[in-house]
Amino acid sequence: MNSGGSDSFDYLLQLTKALSAECRANRQETDRIELLLKRLAKQSGISYDNLSKNIIPDSWKDNASQKASPPTEAQKLISENFKLIYEIEKQEYFNTKAVALINNINEHFSYIKNFIDEQNAIRERNIATFSSEKLDERNKSLQQNYESLKTENEETKKKLHSIIKQFEKLLKEVDWDRISKDSRDYSRFKKQLEYLQDTYQVLK
């Protein structure tokens, strides 16, 4: 379908919707007038048929004895158009609700993702800080014990060896992949390890 045909169809659809809404409004107004006349007849003690005889056209009145004539082709087409308009309006309503629901779900997913990313970032910073602090404490303890034990006997050497093994074990327990290699704490700790190795040759 070319753009001109599409524009014409859209215009016809909007016009048909407007006519449909106007017909519904007119029908509601007709029903309202008929209801008011029935109330007036009841309050006045006058038969509704007598009251509406010269007011309401015969085409408005219900006549069970009259048999409805079969609908013409034009009436059938109009009825089908009204059904089509109703289906289109219903589909547009559901589409609007579906889009709103999808947007709402996407908003919640975005919020959850941002929350998880933020928590992961905080956890990684905490892990790096915690590891650095613990390693600093062990490093200080190692140096102090080394100074106090280096002049003692063979038993002292065994204790020193045990401390070194504990330190090596601690290094193996650290999850290095979760620590940023560009962080200040990691650079400082790496320098401390190099210092221990160069000064005391305690690490293999």
UniProtKB/Swiss-Prot annotation:
Protein name: Factor arrest protein 3
Domain of life: Eukaryota
Protein function: Participates in the control of the reentry into the cell cycle following pheromone treatment.
Keyword Repeat: no
Note: Present with 1540 molecules/cell in log phase SD medium.
Swiss-Prot/TrEMBL keywords: Cell cycle, Endoplasmic reticulum
GO biological process, one term: cellular response to pheromone
Record's subcellular location: Endoplasmic reticulum
Cellular component terms per the entry's GO annotation: cell periphery; endoplasmic reticulum; endoplasmic reticulum membrane; FAR/SIN/STRIPAK complex; Golgi cis cisterna
Subunit structure: Component of a complex at least composed of FAR3, FAR7, FAR8, FAR10, FAR11 and VPS64.
Predominant cellular place of this UniProt entry's protein: endoplasmic reticulum
UniProt keyword Endoplasmic reticulum present: yes
Segments forming a coiled coil: none
Gene of this entry: FAR3
